[in-house]
Amino acid sequence: MSDFDLIVIGAGPAGMSATATAAHGGLNVLLLDEQPRPGGQIYRNVGENRSSRGWLGKDYAAGARFVDTLTHPRVTTQCGATVWRLDSGPRVVWSRDGVSHISTAKHVLLAGGAQERPVPFPGWTLPGVMTAGAAQILMKS
């Protein structure tokens, strides 16, 4: 069991910003996200795609500074983590690589991010047809 001042669930722009702000304010923060790297959908793989930043735009490149803030000594980042229970206390139960963990904190912040909601149209399930979000993931992978 580990204790933190704040547990942030979600490592997209909002989660990373909240984590950095809290850490710079003196709080010990645990940042959890299910993806293999922080960044959310908009900054997916920004730390890995340094050569692609130019053609993905300056806003995408700016996301690297968010990822860089996660190296603060008061921040513990766990990517590839699945949160499967949140109890009073608050107590967060999560797993990573098949190992379960229990972390407690004074506060929990949920930064679940955005989710694309596609609108079905004739032919939308045909091979090669994809949503804007799927195309964005493909470009950044």
Predicted features by range, described:
Residues 1-4, 9, 62-141:
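FAD-binding core/adjacent interface of flavoenzyme oxidoreductases
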Residues 4-62:
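Beta1-alpha1 glycine-rich phosphate/pyrophosphate-binding loop at the start
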